Amino acid sequence: MNATNVAIEEAAVPLRAQRRHPKTFTEMLVSSIIGLIASLVLSIDAVVLAANPSADLNCNINAAISCGKVGLSWQASLLGFPNAFLGLIAEPVVITIAVAALGGVRFPRWFLNSAQVVYLIGFLFAYWLFYQAYFVIGALCPWCLLITITTTTVFVSLLRVNILDNNLGLPPKLHESLSIGLRAGADTMGVLIIFAILAGLIFVKYGSVIFGG
C-alpha cells in the first residue's frame, strides 16, 4: 500500500469517529482550566501564609468565608505540602486529555480506567475537604469550593465517557441501561442535585453570616 492509498483511507474515516464526545470533553476542558486557575490562586495563598500566617488574604471576607483560616488548617496540607499543589499537577493532565480527545486521539481503555480511578480519589478527597471545612474548621474557602465543583464536573464527564464507551467492561444489560440514562441527562441531573445539596448546606449554616443577617 503506497502513501497515496493510505491518505485516501485516512480521509475516508468519518470525522465523528475521530472526535467522540466533543461536548463532554469540552466540559472537561473548561472545568479543568477553571480548576487550574483556582489551584494556582490557592498555591499562591499557601506561599503567602507560609511566610506570614497572619496575612490578610483577599478572600478573608468574614467569619464564614475565610481562606486564611482554611489554609492554615492541617487539612489544607494533608500530605505535608499544600493540597493546591496537587491541582497544579492534575489539572494540566486533564487539560491535555481533553484537548487530545477533541483533536481525535483515541486513548486505550487502561489509560481511561486509570484516569477514572485517579479522579475518583480526587473526587472523594475534594468532598472530604468540604466536610472538614464545614463541620470541623468552621469556615469556607471560595476557591476550594470552586475546585470541589470543577472536580465533580470532570469526574462525572470522564465517567460518562467511560460508561458510554464501556471502558469499564460492564455487562451488556447494565451498560445499555446506564447508557440510556446518560443520554437522557441523568448525569447532569445528578451533578445539579449534588450542587444543590452543597448550596443548601452552606445556606443553612452560614446564610445569615454570608448575607449579613
Enumerate the language-model features and the residues they cover.
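Hydrophobic cores of alpha-helical transmembrane segments in multi-pass inner/ER membrane proteins
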Residues: 2-3, 32, 89-95, 147-165, ...
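Membrane-interfacial, low-structure loops and terminal tails that flank and connect transmembrane helices
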Residues: 2-22, 165-185
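N-terminal signal-anchor transmembrane alpha helix
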Residues: 22-50, 196-203
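Extracytosolic (periplasmic/ER-lumenal) interhelical loops and adjacent juxtamembrane/interface segments
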Residues: 47-82
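Membrane-interface loop-to-helix entry segments
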Residues: 71-93, 140-152
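Hydrophobic alpha-helical transmembrane segments
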Residues: 81-103, 121, 125
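Membrane-interface helix caps and helix-loop-helix hairpins in membrane proteins
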Residues: 106, 130-142
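Juxtamembrane boundary at the C-terminal end of a transmembrane helix
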Residues: 199-213
